[in-house]
Amino acid sequence: MIRLSQWIKACSLDQVKEGQLFGFHSDDKKILLANQKGKIFATDLICTHADADLSTGFLSDEGVRCPLHLSVFNLQDGKPQNLPAEIPLKTYNVKIEQDEIYVEV
Ligand code: FES
């Protein structure tokens, strides 16, 4: 089955202020939004190492740090910067239209 990507509306821009994380669910997808220095990134919400919700983690210049075992994931390519996580997070395209954030899933 071919699954075409589609843009889904995530939330309004003012729900993800600079330095903040925001998690949401859409059908079977669990997505994390992060506002790093005014730019919005979208990745999977659940850590690739175990079942940790990254929206309860910590955002820094390096990326998002998992709250459970503290791996940091780069927001552009999803790659873990330190163990124990070894598998990259999936990343998603983001667009902003009329102060609403959309993610391509
Ligand atoms: S659950 Fe995220 S690093 Fe272990």
Residue ranges and their predicted role:
Residues 61-67, 81-89:
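Short cysteine/histidine-rich metal-coordination sites, predominantly Zn2+-binding motifs
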Residues 1-61, 74-75, 88-105:
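N-terminal pre-ligand scaffold of iron-sulfur
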Residues 47, 66-69:
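Short cysteine clusters
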